[in-house]
Every structure is written in C-alpha cells, then in structure tokens.
Amino acid sequence: MSDKSHQIYCYFWLFGLINNVLYVVILSAAVDIVGPTLPKSLVLLADIFPSLAIKLCSPFFIDRIKYSYRIWSLITMSCLGMFLVSFKNLFVCLLGISFASISSGFGEVTFLQLTHYYKQISLNGWSSGTGGAGIIGGASYMFLTSIFKVPVKLTLLVFSLLPFAFLFYFKLESNDTNLTYQSLQQIDEAEDDQLVPFPVAFTHTNASQSLYSTRQHILQTVKRLRRLVFPYMVPLTTVYLFEYLINQAVAPTLLFPINGDERSKSMPFFFHKYRDIYVTYGTLYQLGVFISRSFGHLMRMRSLYILAFLQGVNLCITVLQSWFYVTHSPWAVMILIFYEGFLGGASYVNTFLNILEQEDPDETEFAMGAVSIADSFGVFLAALLGLGLEPKLCRHQIADDRPWCRME
C-alpha cells in the first residue's frame, strides 16, 4: 500500500468511526435513557427514523450541496445532538437523538459518495471505521459506565466532542470533491430525448421549464433507484431488520439471575445490574461487526440473500431462548450475539463491494448513496416491530417467574 493509499484509508477509517460512534453510544445507552419499563426500541426509533428520512430524500437534493458544506452541517448537528442527549428529560433526549440521527444518515450518504472518488481503498477504510465505531463506542460506554462508574451524563458529553474530527476532510487531497457531484449530469441524452438534466445550481429560466426539469429529474431518479432494489436493497434491509430486532427487542430480555443463590458461578464479574448484561451484548455485537467489516473484503460473499437467511435463523434462536429459557448460562448467548454482529457487518461490506464491482462507473456514486437507504429502512422496521415484541416477551417472562426484564 502506497503512502497516499494508506493516508486515504486512515482518513476514511476515521470518518466511518466518527459518523457511527454516536449512533452506537446512543443505542448502548438506551437502557439508561428510557429505563427498564419502556421498550428500548423507542430509542431505536428516534435514532433511525430521521436518518432514514434524510437518506430517502437525499437522492433528490444532495447533488446541490458541496461536500465542504455537508461536513460543517455534520459537525453542528452531531455536537448539538449529543449535548441534548445528556439531559435527563426524556423529550429533550429524544430530540437530541433525532439531531444525531440526521447527522449519521447524512454523513453515511456523503462519505459513501466520496468513496466514488477514492475507490475501493476508501470503502475498505470506511467499512472498517464503521465497524470500529461499534466496538469502540460500545466498549468505551461499557467500561466507563459499568466498570469505572463514570456518570452517564458526563460520558455522553465527552462523546459530543468527537465530531470535530470530521475536519480532517479538508486534509484530503483535492479530487474535485468540493464541487457538487456530476453523475446526474452524465446521463446519455441519446437514450431518452425527453430527459432534461437537473441543474447543479438554478439559472434564470421560466417557471414552466424549471418545473419540467424538476419532474423529469424525480422520474429519472426513481427509475435509477428501482434497478437497485432486489440486487442490493432487499437483502440488506432484511439482514438489518433481523439483527436490530435481536439487539433492541430480544436482547433486553435475554437475561440471567445476578443476585443470590441463583447467580451462576460462570457469570462475568462486572454483571452487577441487569443493564450491564444488555450493554455487554451491545459490545459483543459491535465486536463482530468490526471484525467482519474490517476483513470482509478478504472473505467475499456475493450472494447477499444467504446472509439474510442466516440472520433470520439467529432471530429465531434468540426468541426461543427468551421465551423458553433454554440455556441458563450467558456464554452461549454472548457467542451468538457476537456471531450475529459478524453476519451484519459482512452483509454491509459485501453489499457495497458488489456495487463497486458490478455497477457502471457513471452510476457508482449514486448507487453507493442510494443503497444506504436499505439498512436504515431495515432498522426502522425493526424499531416499529420491537415496540410490541419486547413488552410481549417481558410479560411472558414475568408470568414464567423471570421478572428480570423489569428490574435494574
């Protein structure tokens, strides 16, 4: 790897880390934000819906915004969001989560599009960085709050300073990325005489021409999106639906007794509260994500639907454990959660590697940003379903004389 390639890899690793670490910390803090009585999917919903909305809308407007302007927007929204999350008021917390979510979704689209300019080395760095965000965010939150007993508010405020690392974007060697991207302007008009390229900046035209241009731009964008649905979006959505149902709806109920004679001798020493179990699951999940996103390019899986099927099997196993209490030791569940994260990370990196390999170069930048809608949509569906699934599992456990899901 040349010095230039190494530098690009490191920068995109850092961008992936910072863009995702706040998302991870917020999900790790879900049990501290809403407590044991409210479903953790409430935090997931606030953490994913704004991100999904910005991703759904971005193909229609993002080409007008310079990358430098996007970076400053990311820093502002992320810092403000984490500052608000540190408040104890639930409404203010959820508002802060929404700001951080918008930043995360907008950042993912932005940096995935930037990989179009810096090729696979940048995607490898980005994917590894997003995986690193998981393990660093999850593990640091676990160590700070569960082992070192740092107050949750102070921990969240410390994380609010991290987005300033996005300023390293301005250290990237110029590759015309300060301009708005031009892929929408590269449509071959010979293929469709009626297509009118959407302008990067508005010019003085009459209202009817502008309206016609906008309508044609929207129709063309929808046409380009439709082609990406089944090869990339459906399997990625399915994987994320299954894994986030596990993480935010089932995992909070995968508990074991930590007090008295019922406590297993094999229980980790730092399991003092039931929230410690949940936070540990999150860390193990993120460890699996980190490993697969870092080395997924070495273990290529081009059939994305296989990964979706395997993740569905994991969901079934965890629901059975929650309902029937099959194993009384946490270690088997902890290994399964790690494996679940590994599959999720593998699905993510292989999806975008497939795009780089299979899509036309003129369409790659658009496809990279557009397909990022899929993972957020899967998480959004999981959040909605989880609002009902976690309470149902918890009620069954209480009736089965396992009231741990309502205990701190």
Swiss-Prot record:
GO terms for biological process: L-arginine transmembrane transport; lysine transport; regulation of intracellular pH. Residues 1-30 form the signal peptide. It is found in: Vacuole membrane. It comes from the Eukaryota. The keyword NAD does not apply. It is a multi-pass membrane protein. Disulfide bonds: none annotated. Keywords: Amino-acid transport, Membrane, Signal, Transmembrane, Transmembrane helix, Transport, Vacuole. The chain crosses the membrane at residues 42-62, 80-100, 128-148, 150-170, 238-258, 323-343, 369-389. Coiled coil: none annotated. The keyword Metal-binding does not apply. It holds the Pfam family CLN3. SUPFAM superfamilies: MFS general substrate transporter (SSF103473). One of its GO terms (cellular component) is vacuolar membrane. InterPro entries: Battenin_disease_Cln3, Battenin_disease_Cln3_subgr, MFS_trans_sf. Belongs to the battenin family. Plays a role in vacuolar arginine transport. Involved in pH homeostasis. May be involved in ion homeostasis together with IST2. Not necessary for mitochondrial function or ATP synthase degradation. This is Protein BTN1. It comes from Saccharomyces cerevisiae (strain ATCC 204508 / S288c) (Baker's yeast).
